[in-house]
Amino acid sequence: MAHTGTATLINAERTDRTLRLLETFPSLTITIRQDTSGRDLVSSVYSATGMSAAARNLNPIANVKNMRQPGYVKPAHTATNTVPLRVATSTGLELPTAHLAQMPVDQALRDAVAAAVPAHAARVLPPNVDRVTPLTLASRVAMVCAGLDCDDIHEIAPAPTAMALAFTTKVLLIHVVVDGTGASIAVNPGAARDLLKADQLGNVITNYGYDVRGTVRRDTAAALAPSELPDTYPIEWLGLICGLIATQIELDLDMLAMNQTEQKLIAPHVQAVDPFINRLQSYATLSSRLMHLCVTHAQRPFRDFPELLRHWQKPELTPAIPVNIALKGAALEVSGNGAELFRVRALPIGGM
């Protein structure tokens, strides 16, 4: 007669495992999910989780809802174990030792933060900070907009725009240029750092959408554009977060291009290039350098990451071609030389 408390000695074997590459680069992290159930065959699925995790700051309330639990305590700076860089940046913390993926804080950045979160600018970016990781700053802006103080996590008033976006699940990033005739879709002519100015925050348009499944009635709103809401819904913080994420991607690519050790680790994973570029395309309109990298891959796909990084360091290896950008349905169609090159698709941002 079997006892009810008898331990189960035979368990189903776990055939899946998860690995992460480029963990020291917050926006470039790549996750590998492998299934070893097949005989003599390992199925690997690559995903650019670093850029996907960064995009979740664009839906702050859904991103930080786990911090709203009673009794939540912010992790201490002096933890027993070193906090991973990606965890530190996504929670608004910073590592005790300064790393290279930082940018200097100038007056233009402080003015941009003051325009985005005027009531909390001094707490989001303290006056004594002279260097900051862009993704850490984006996380702190998102926490404030979600209704949580970025220093001690006490409740504050959330941003009205964040409340309106809480149930959306994806966002399309569009950069527009305003001239005398109106606004038109165009690539940011400079680097992503150029977006971090108070007068440039409104040039990034965010179109939010919902996942509509087959069993759901299609009589609800299909999209939500914060720029079309009344003036009581501020949108400057959205443009600031978009610019900070794109700046982080550029910084991390610069650092990875100079890190031979990490390049040797990522070089054998040639299958990771396509998922990485596919996610990078969602940020292409925010920077001319990112757009040029995506267009180059569309013309002649990169064989591996070292080749991708060579073209990042030396864009002149592939001459730039004029491209046209048109809004087609839920994506932006980028075409050149009379053919479609790729599509800028919406980013998943979670949801409530």
UniProtKB/Swiss-Prot annotation:
Record bears the keyword RNA-binding: yes
- Tell me which InterPro entries the record gives: Reovirus_polyG_pol (IPR002507)
Q: Which GO terms describe its molecular function?
A: RNA-directed RNA polymerase activity; single-stranded RNA binding
From what superkingdom does this record's organism come?
A: Viruses
**Key word Transcription regulation present:** no
Q: Which Pfam families match?
A: PolyG_pol (PF01518)
Q: Which UniProt keywords apply?
A: RNA-binding
> So what family is this one in?
Belongs to the aquareoviridae NS2 protein family.
Subunit structure, as described in the record? Homomultimer.
Task: Relate the protein's function as given in its record.
Answer: Protein that binds to ssRNA and may be involved in genome packaging.
Protein name in the entry: Non-structural protein 2
Give the species. Answer: Aquareovirus C (isolate Golden shiner/USA/GSRV/1977) (AQRV-C)
